[in-house]
Amino acid sequence: MRLPVPDQVLPADRLGRVHFVGIGGAGLSGIARIMLARGITVSGSDGTDSPTLTALRELGARVHLGHDAAHVHDVDTLVVSTAVREDNPEYVEAVRQGLRVLPRSAALAAVMAGRRVVAVAGTHGKTTTTSLLTVALQAAGADPTYAIGGDLAATGVNAAEGTGDLFVAEADESDGAFLHYSPYAAVVTNIEADHLDQWGTPEAYAAAFDEFADTLAPDGFLVCVADDPGAAALAERHRAAGRRVVTVSARDAGALDGVTLWSPGEHYLADALAALAAGVELGYAAADLARGLASYTGTKRRMERKGEAGGVRVYDSYAHHPTEIAGDLQAARAVAGSGRVVVAFQPHLVSRTRIFGTAMGRALGAADEVVVLDVYLAREDPDPEVTGALVAGAVPLPAERVAYVADFDAVAAELVARARPGDLVLTLGAGTVTAIGPRVLGLLDG
């Protein structure tokens, strides 16, 4: 369910008692964590228990398992994620009571109020770049508040309240959320057509980034990765309009001489350079920022090492767009060395697979062995014409090196049957495929 953002969003300390529907998700849990740190009364509900819910309880949140209208009594504001359906009993009850109901983006804007916001946007690389900028600023002596779409390995959390005036935030373009943040500065990693179920056309999608850049403070700045045509064009347009614009390129990595990053891959190098440039524009010393980049050990589900068993290394990543798939397979190839890359890919959303399924399959051709799962539906309805078979059929590898496995519980065994000592197994996708890696390790250990 997508809710409109109110024309005026109150600061978080004026929202009263806040209840999150879907509090365990990556987006809402971080906002809840920041509100709790500010002394705001927080409650929430989710369908299943998790370590995230345990952590929020320990911070003082009242968390319910399951959804019930009774959970929103004595609540002033309801915050919902896009995964919440219109018939959710808590949402229905909040509307009946006339409570303030906010989408995730408005709740994030509420906790940003009064801070100097650096918003990180782009089709790919938002989470990694936001993470890199956060650790770089911390190393340089800043203590920013941050909200990221994944858990930082160094802290184990996806958000934290800082003592400084900076707020580093991942800015999601999928539903237009990033148009409501009014940041001081922004980083744009790339612009490539995606979320066309929301935007309709590639042109409308790209135009949203222009509108986003127009929301920056007059004395703020824009950092763009010039390796990407869309981001480079955005930089040129806004430089011509008088905006302070900085461009970076992975082809000019001299600023990071002597810095060993946590993962190979040109896209990760570009992310690090963008973070460095933003930190310098904020007034911090490049050497201090680079020290932070060198200390970065990753973010959950971004080329995350899950373990090794039977001589097989297992990694997991969130990549679900063709460009992201290609980038992470490049990185996996570098990590694998002389070993082969065996990938399990779970297409994400019927709407995305319908548009990009063939391109996904072509990108997967950079692996040595490919297992394609069925489409992870999330909030969408199935379409018998759009399944994982569409992706598998487009992989440019011999048939014996590609498998479409619709039975989720059979995927781990299929990967183990294909992997050999020295190989790297990589699970890719934004859905439940992340659970496959531990199963593979368990089978290899057994």
From Swiss-Prot:
<dbReference type="Pfam" id="PF01225">
    <property type="entry name" value="Mur_ligase"/>
</dbReference>
<dbReference type="GO" id="GO:0008360">
    <property type="term" value="P:regulation of cell shape"/>
</dbReference>
<keyword id="KW-0963">Cytoplasm</keyword>
<keyword id="KW-0573">Peptidoglycan synthesis</keyword>
<keyword id="KW-0132">Cell division</keyword>
<comment type="pathway">
    <text>Cell wall biogenesis; peptidoglycan biosynthesis.</text>
</comment>
<comment type="similarity">
    <text>Belongs to the MurCDEF family.</text>
</comment>
<keyword id="KW-0067">ATP-binding</keyword>
<keyword id="KW-0133">Cell shape</keyword>
<keyword id="KW-0961">Cell wall biogenesis/degradation</keyword>
<feature type="binding site">
    <location>
        <begin position="122"/>
        <end position="128"/>
    </location>
    <ligand>
        <name>ATP</name>
    </ligand>
</feature>
<dbReference type="GO" id="GO:0051301">
    <property type="term" value="P:cell division"/>
</dbReference>
<protein>
    <recommendedName>
        <fullName>UDP-N-acetylmuramate--L-alanine ligase</fullName>
        <ecNumber>6.3.2.8</ecNumber>
    </recommendedName>
</protein>
<comment type="function">
    <text>Cell wall formation.</text>
</comment>
<dbReference type="InterPro" id="IPR005758">
    <property type="entry name" value="UDP-N-AcMur_Ala_ligase_MurC"/>
</dbReference>
<dbReference type="InterPro" id="IPR036615">
    <property type="entry name" value="Mur_ligase_C_dom_sf"/>
</dbReference>
<keyword id="KW-0547">Nucleotide-binding</keyword>
<dbReference type="GO" id="GO:0008763">
    <property type="term" value="F:UDP-N-acetylmuramate-L-alanine ligase activity"/>
</dbReference>
<dbReference type="GO" id="GO:0005737">
    <property type="term" value="C:cytoplasm"/>
</dbReference>
<keyword id="KW-0131">Cell cycle</keyword>
<dbReference type="Pfam" id="PF08245">
    <property type="entry name" value="Mur_ligase_M"/>
</dbReference>
<dbReference type="GO" id="GO:0071555">
    <property type="term" value="P:cell wall organization"/>
</dbReference>
<dbReference type="InterPro" id="IPR013221">
    <property type="entry name" value="Mur_ligase_cen"/>
</dbReference>
<dbReference type="GO" id="GO:0005524">
    <property type="term" value="F:ATP binding"/>
</dbReference>
<dbReference type="InterPro" id="IPR000713">
    <property type="entry name" value="Mur_ligase_N"/>
</dbReference>
<dbReference type="InterPro" id="IPR036565">
    <property type="entry name" value="Mur-like_cat_sf"/>
</dbReference>
<dbReference type="InterPro" id="IPR050061">
    <property type="entry name" value="MurCDEF_pg_biosynth"/>
</dbReference>
<dbReference type="InterPro" id="IPR004101">
    <property type="entry name" value="Mur_ligase_C"/>
</dbReference>
<keyword id="KW-0436">Ligase</keyword>
<dbReference type="Pfam" id="PF02875">
    <property type="entry name" value="Mur_ligase_C"/>
</dbReference>
<dbReference type="GO" id="GO:0009252">
    <property type="term" value="P:peptidoglycan biosynthetic process"/>
</dbReference>
